[in-house]
Regions:
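N-terminal and secondary-structure boundary signal
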Residues: 1-276
Length: 276
């Protein structure tokens, strides 16, 4: 299913470049007791990449993104209450190896990226993290995930983390991000206060949001969390700050498309309570 999203929280349509984002869900990816089913997750990611790149096979899509000669940093997220699932890290690494990237030229890291030789010498990055609300940024999504690439993260917390887009212009990451994967297996849709976590506001959405444009991926993710708040509370209950950094990344830093009207959202798989 293909949809063009409405304006939502992020602005009005204008005649400018568009972006493509794939949302894929599978009601079986969280098995008994919420355990991630690795092979189902692999098939979800593969189908998303194939659809995003318009290729005949998943591996052909991966080969459009990465070369065997690349040095690849997988920028994950280790926040203890809702980290990137290790199964998702594993299936990403599996496909990089399948493309022919040497094992020694692949690493997965979060808070140690500035001291990690693979990341410091990376020719390509893959950005992967869970979708959740965030005290300083409104939402914790792909743009926010690169805050560990600076030695002073707190300096980027002003005005709803509006300066986050600037990090993407620094040489350590500029132009290197080949794919953004927002893990929406169990997103957190509401929270107030620093490091807030409450399982009442986490739900088994069982999805992945995938794209080459981090701004568009984040805009879709923020829209999903907003839609869930409306469904849960009967209104869009306010966060500590609105996720204005997504629009700033578009308007000021020109990193991608924040306008939901200019995002082609391709929805695959399980459609029950898809919300957007």
């Amino acid at each position: 299913m293909v949809a063009t999203l409405g304006p939502g929280i992020l602005g009005e349509a204008r005649a400018e470049p568009t972006a493509k984002v794939v949302l894929i869900r599978n009601r079986g990816v969280l098995g008994d007791q919420g355990r991630v089913q690795t092979e189902i997750l692999q098939s979800m990611l593969d189908e998303a990449v194939k659809t995003l790149l318009g290729t005949n096979s998943p591996l052909e899509g991966w080969r459009k993104l990465f070369k065997s000669s690349d040095v690849v940093g997988i920028k994950s997220n280790t926040w203890a209450r809702l980290p990137t699932p290790m199964e998702l890290e594993a299936v990403i690494k599996r496909r990089l190896l399948d493309v022919g990237v040497a094992d020694k030229n692949i690493d997965i890291d979060d808070r140690g990226v500035l001291n990690n030789p693979v990341f410091l010498n990376a020719t390509a990055l893959l950005n992967v993290r869970p979708l959740r609300t965030h005290h300083w940024a409104g939402v914790g999504t792909c743009l926010k995930n690169y805050i560990q690439f600076v030695p002073n993260p707190s300096a980027y917390h002003d005005e709803g983390c509006s300066p986050l887009g600037k990090i993407w212009t620094y040489p350590v990451v500029k132009g290197k991000t080949r794919l953004n994967v927002l893990c929406a297996l169990t997103p957190q849709f509401y929270g107030r206060g620093a490091n807030f976590f409450d399982r009442r506001y986490v739900w088994p959405y069982q999805g992945l949001i995938v794209g080459t444009d981090p701004v568009a991926v984040d805009a879709v993710g923020a829209h999903l969390l907003q839609a869930k708040r409306v469904a849960f509370f009967g209104e869009d209950r306010a966060l500590d700050v609105p996720p204005i950094h997504i629009m700033v990344a578009d308007k000021t830093y020109h990193l991608g498309v924040s306008d939901l009207n200019r995002i082609e959202l391709i929805k695959l798989g399980w459609g029950e309570e898809v919300l957007i």
